Swiss-Prot record:
<feature type="active site" description="Proton donor">
    <location>
        <position position="229"/>
    </location>
</feature>
<feature type="glycosylation site" description="N-linked (GlcNAc...) asparagine">
    <location>
        <position position="99"/>
    </location>
</feature>
<protein>
    <recommendedName>
        <fullName>Probable exopolygalacturonase C</fullName>
        <ecNumber>3.2.1.67</ecNumber>
    </recommendedName>
</protein>
<feature type="glycosylation site" description="N-linked (GlcNAc...) asparagine">
    <location>
        <position position="311"/>
    </location>
</feature>
<comment type="function">
    <text>Specific in hydrolyzing the terminal glycosidic bond of polygalacturonic acid and oligogalacturonates.</text>
</comment>
<keyword id="KW-0961">Cell wall biogenesis/degradation</keyword>
<keyword id="KW-0326">Glycosidase</keyword>
<dbReference type="GO" id="GO:0005576">
    <property type="term" value="C:extracellular region"/>
</dbReference>
<feature type="glycosylation site" description="N-linked (GlcNAc...) asparagine">
    <location>
        <position position="417"/>
    </location>
</feature>
<feature type="disulfide bond">
    <location>
        <begin position="387"/>
        <end position="393"/>
    </location>
</feature>
<feature type="repeat" description="PbH1 3">
    <location>
        <begin position="265"/>
        <end position="288"/>
    </location>
</feature>
<feature type="repeat" description="PbH1 1">
    <location>
        <begin position="215"/>
        <end position="236"/>
    </location>
</feature>
<feature type="glycosylation site" description="N-linked (GlcNAc...) asparagine">
    <location>
        <position position="334"/>
    </location>
</feature>
<dbReference type="InterPro" id="IPR000743">
    <property type="entry name" value="Glyco_hydro_28"/>
</dbReference>
<keyword id="KW-0378">Hydrolase</keyword>
<dbReference type="Pfam" id="PF00295">
    <property type="entry name" value="Glyco_hydro_28"/>
</dbReference>
<feature type="glycosylation site" description="N-linked (GlcNAc...) asparagine">
    <location>
        <position position="301"/>
    </location>
</feature>
Amino acid sequence: MSVFKASFLFLLSSSLVHGVPHSSRASRSQQCVVPSKYQASNGMADDSVAVSQAFAQCATDSVIIFEEGVNYNIFQPITATNLSNVEIRMHGNLHLPQNITAVQNIVSDGTSTWFTLEGPKVDWIGPEDVNNGWIDSYGQPWWDANPAGSSGIDNRPHLMSFKSSQATMKYFRSRKPIAWNVKLHGQDITVSHAIIDATSTGSFPFNTDGFDVEGTNIQITDSIMYNGDDAIAVGADSHDTLFTRNTIGYQTHGMSIGSLGKDPTDFANISNIRFDDVTVVDGLYAARFKSWSGGTGLVKNVTWNNIRVFNVTFPIFVTQSYSDQGASRSGTVNASSAVMMEDFTWSDFAGSINTYQPGDGSCVSDPCWYNVGLPNLKHTEALIIECHTAQSCKNFVTDNIQLYPQVLEPASVICMNATAALNPDLGFTCKNGTYSPLSN
């Protein structure tokens, strides 16, 4: 049994009491059942027009029904930005085009996202039956078409933008996404029991982020994400975010804050972010903070707690000097500036550090992007903390870090500029060498 299937079965057997749609809903008195021409056309006909019509006719106080077990071809992007109090009952299966050139032409013409959904009180509700409710994007040929030395071919679409308030996504399922999965932005959004499967049988699945989050009071729970980038990335101007009871893996880049500060004029404002009770399998990162040097802003009150890691290269990683091999930077940068970090906690970590085969398939630069500034890596590091200045990190706390390298040597640490004066409860002495937690 694969790790992905085992993880799914574990979560399926757990209680399904979370992620229930908000109870204070006005009546959804109208229904639109989306017709499909998929079966009659042997999978050739496009159902995009019918889907767009359903979203137009049932944009308010309605239920839009994709019937259970029915397949739909979505060969054109769907945009529905005037929704209000709508349930999208996704019990069918959606199929994106398999013609790479056709999709690239659509993206190059200006449509970068395949599903754009916007409005208050929007609920995406899939079925408990794992055989249905999928979006099939057929990303494997896209990944395999990526030339050597490149981090993804041009004109790849984002799968979904979901902008709402008092909203729910339950049983969202994405298989072989081309690249980015869901951009969540808004307030009071709950995601539960999602599955994202971006495991590859060939080339690396670049940029297959799970959920990119910007907003207030957003929760993601009881979900599985196997991908080739951040499982969750919390962006600027986010507050009160919870990521809990999830399993993430494959070549995941973990639970991330950022990246922040690429544009020095974009002030980062993030607070009250919690990652709790998460299992990370075979990832490049588990807990990560990433901001560019020269950035501005404040990130405050962030906690990673009760994190189990298995074969993870960088279990705890902080950098305020981030670089992206696939992105250029313009404008004037104040090299002494940094996005400030305050009140960060890493507690109750346990598991194994990937010493034998560290890294992942995303490296196309020399030195590798994730090794930049770290020339003497031993891949026994439990923690890497790179504060940009002696003032940019404040009130860092570590507690009960039980991480061990696969070679069964003592764990090590790389630490820069997390001064004792500003971080009296850091839990270890900030210097490079063997990780030796201080007694309380």
